[in-house]
Amino acid sequence: MDNKKSSQLWQITCNKSQLKLIAKALENYSRRLGGQFSRYEDIVIRDLAEKRMIAANTEDNFDYQKFSEELQKTLIDLKKLLFPEFPDGSGSYGFDHTPEIGNSYQIYRTIYHELSKENNDNSVYRRPPLPSGTLGPIKVEKIKKDYGKEQ
C-alpha cells in the first residue's frame, strides 16, 4: 500500500448495535486467522451452536452432550486441516503469520475498549488494546448528536 493511500482518513457513522456487529466480525476474523477454531472462541460457531441447542431443546431425542462433543471434534479436525502449524495451540497476539491478525485485533479491541469505557464496566476491554499490526491505531468516539433511534 503506498503512503498516500494509507494516510487517507475515512469515517463510518453507525449506531451502537452496528458498532458492536463490526467489532464482533473483526474479532472473529482475527481469531480465525490465528487458528482459533473452537466452539468457544469462534463467535459465529458459538452463536450457531447455541441456536441449534435451543431449538433442539424441544426434541426428545436431542443429545446435548453428544452434539457438543461432535461439534468440538469437527472443529479440531478443521483446525488441523487449515492450520497444520498449530498442532495444539493457535497464533495470537504477537504471532507473525499475517499482519491482518494484528490489524484486525487493533480495530476490534479499540471498539470494545470504547464501549467498555462508556458502559463503565470492568471487563478485559477496560484497558486500551496492545499496539499491533502494521496499520496503527484507530479512533472511535461517540457522536453527541442523536441521529435516530438506536437499535
Which positions does each model-derived feature cover?
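Positively charged, low-complexity terminal tracts
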Residues: 2-151
